[in-house]
């Protein structure tokens, strides 16, 4: 027994030393070290870091320099740290949509662009000319085997335009997670499914309750320039020629032409027994013309190699977007959208965490991969490109911590993560936060679908267990009135020229959270196994596919 005790004592000393080393390195993440990068990236010199602009180039140059100073190596094969990717800017310049009587091939009614509908080419074509297309109402347009749900039962939609109800079913907490908006409820899923099913077009019915925002958001957003990852020459762009939205009023008029009651059909979609409905003798003719411009964007990818020969080809993926909105129409003489909170702050936290992992390099088994992406603000396109063109095998990525914003308004008692309860990675956050007496909470507004609105979503789509840390809500030392003021200021500054460092900023909360997630990352780096989605999660199948299971 004495010999066992003597053998055990050095092990305890080793563990204590390692723990002390972790705390010491984590303590080097300070308010000053976080502000250092924010003050540079959010300065006017970087011109708002717009995608494909001179400001983006300046940001890339700065990031590569910082990564080299940290001691990271390039995460792309050519050693440049830069993953370029081509984008297309698309703007619809001419459009018409009319209801037709199929039996006579005649138009009987015309919708008004912007007021009744918005539409655009779905396959990066310059012109679309659809005549007398048949219409099929497909409810939510969802196929979800894990929910025993198929809105395309016994119907062939090839060559037809499908009409889709927005969102996903909310009638039962045990079906599609109740009021929590899953990816099935996002408009991107609807359009992807239309392409997969071979539909000629896809139109989503807008209502404010199902969208969570008014028609003005749809009409203003989709009538402006939109962006896409450019399809490779000769690539299959799919058979879907157009996508769009239709107002509730215009949709009601369309269904009445077919002798159908829209409200009844919207209600009927809330059942696994729903069957698609053909709009008899009623079609649509659609003409669109769009203009395009080419944009060259850049991701920055870096690596810190792990020390374990068996595990160093597996990775903790840290992600953050460095782009913002660039230069826009002046407001009170200011035209630069500096993007301090969104997302110079998140990039700074990533760089600070990476610096800590470099110092711990002999003690980390797996490697760290940092993807600092562009084009998040125009549709999560930088992370989409990386996920579809990964610089390491997807099955080798142990988990993803996405840093989009941070807590710039002071310390909180609690921690919020988007992705709470969905993966073993989320469980690690709970374990580490519990050690320091901080409760972990889920997203307070699951109906907004925040899980699908930042770069970690593209990582999840290809199977990588991912979390998105958010500021806590229980602030320390702030009154209710103070928090109302801060909330109001933060909301007003979001996506505006006023997103700059201001008098309300207090980075003590950012430090506290960054140190916590630094330790969560260490758990991923040194765990026996890579992270996993919990059984039944919507991304579990993608993970198993990436692991060839």
List where the protein language model places each region:
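Bacterial Sec-dependent N-terminal signal peptides
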Residues: 1-25
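N-terminal hydrophobic or amphipathic helices/low-complexity stretches enriched
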Residues: 17-77, 97, 250-251, 257, ...
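Soluble metallo-hydrolase cores and metallopeptidase-like ectodomains found primarily
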Residues: 21-22, 101-105, 118-154, 235-339, ...
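Extracellular/luminal Protease-associated
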Residues: 23, 113-234, 305, 338, ...
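Noncatalytic luminal/extracellular "stalk/propeptide" segments of secretory-pathway proteins
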Residues: 47-172, 280, 424
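Metal-dependent peptidase/peptidase-like ectodomains
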Residues: 112-115, 127-128, 229-261, 373-479, ...
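Active-site-adjacent substrate-binding region
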Residues: 175, 195, 206, 264-267, ...
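Acidic/histidine-rich catalytic neighborhood of metal-dependent amide-processing enzymes
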Residues: 183, 189, 193, 209-210, ...
